[in-house]
């Protein structure tokens, strides 16, 4: 399954464009959000989001690193690559279920989280969407054009969503929704576009990767 590859210079230039957009984005969103919902509201959502990051990390289970390493070896054999992706996708679903279970348990046993339940459950959608990430596939095939274009599109759409739904000081939960839209957009794009490189199926057998 040979795909067109680009030079290191080209890939570096594309990646630099993505990096510039990623750096500029917070310069627009953070001042707007802190002005509308206040520093306290911004801090609350980002505090919960930082906690959620640990559960997302648990759900990812180091699959991206393993996928890149093994994917590079078999990327020219579609059958083997499909098998690798399907097995890792299945493992990721299982790890996501486990991680989300820990999240629910944590939410209800932590006194500090009781005042943030709505925000926490909105942001927890990030955990559930983790299996759709599949970012490692595009790193295997060095498809930095897709990664860059996808990132820019999602950031622009997310910015529009932010301006539409976050309009006053009470829109703290709406800000959490905006964060989910940013994350979900990338993951959904990744899953849909992955069909260019592989066929993903739920695959369970005794010879799973780990």
Task: Name these PLM-found stretches.
Residues 9, 73, 117, 128-149, ...:
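Membrane-interface junctions at transmembrane-helix termini in multi-pass inner-membrane proteins
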Residues 1-4, 8, 145-148, 172-174, ...:
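Interhelical loop/hinge segments that connect adjacent transmembrane helices in multipass membrane
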Residues 54, 58, 97, 104-108, ...:
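Alpha-helical transmembrane segments of multi-pass membrane proteins
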Residues 60-76:
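Helix-loop junctions and terminal segments of transmembrane helices
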Residues 1-25, 79, 86, 195, ...:
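N-terminal membrane topogenesis motif
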């Amino acid at each position: 399954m040979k795909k067109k590859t680009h030079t290191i210079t080209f890939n570096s230039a594309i990646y630099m464009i993505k990096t510039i957009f990623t750096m500029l984005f917070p310069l627009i969103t953070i001042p707007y959000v802190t002005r509308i919902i206040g520093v306290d509201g911004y801090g609350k959502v980002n505090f919960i989001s930082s906690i959620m990051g640990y559960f997302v990390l648990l759900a990812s289970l180091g699959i991206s690193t393993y996928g890149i390493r093994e994917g590079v070896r078999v990327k020219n054999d579609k059958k083997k690559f499909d098998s690798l992706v399907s097995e890792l996708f299945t493992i990721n679903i299982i790890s996501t279920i486990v991680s989300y279970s820990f999240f629910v348990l944590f939410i209800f046993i932590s006194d500090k989280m009781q005042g943030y339940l709505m925000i926490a459950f909105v942001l927890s959608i990030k955990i559930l969407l983790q299996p759709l990430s599949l970012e490692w596939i595009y790193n295997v095939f060095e498809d930095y054009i897709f990664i860059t274009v996808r990132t820019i599109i999602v950031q622009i759409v997310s910015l529009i969503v932010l301006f539409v739904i976050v309009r006053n000081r009470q829109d703290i939960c709406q800000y959490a929704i905006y964060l989910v839209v940013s994350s979900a957009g990338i993951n959904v794009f990744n899953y849909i576009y992955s069909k260019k490189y592989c066929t993903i199926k739920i695959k369970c057998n005794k010879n799973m990767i780990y």
